[in-house]
UniProtKB/Swiss-Prot annotation:
It comes from Emiliania huxleyi. It is found in: Plastid, Chloroplast thylakoid membrane. GO terms for biological process: photosynthesis. The chain crosses the membrane at residues 17-37. The keyword Lipid biosynthesis does not apply. Its main location: plastid. The lineage of its organism: Eukaryota, Haptista, Haptophyta, Prymnesiophyceae, Isochrysidales. The keyword Transmembrane helix applies. Belongs to the PsbL family. This is Photosystem II reaction center protein L. GO terms for cellular component: chloroplast thylakoid membrane; photosystem II reaction center. InterPro entries: PSII_PsbL, PSII_PsbL_sf. Keywords: Chloroplast, Membrane, Photosynthesis, Photosystem II, Plastid, Reaction center, Thylakoid, Transmembrane, Transmembrane helix. It is a single-pass membrane protein.
């Protein structure tokens, strides 16, 4: 895949924070859509 990265923890931390950000945006989109369609 790619070269072994010695600094693996910050990459995983950024990836998990990115996933949490996407999840938060998804929840906000669902809330706003339900608010507008109600």
């Amino acid at each position: 895949m790619s070269a072994p990265n010695p600094n693996k923890q910050p990459v995983e931390l950024n990836r998990t924070s990115l996933y949490w950000g996407l999840l938060l945006m998804f929840v906000l989109a669902v809330l706003f859509s339900s608010y507008f369609f109600n």
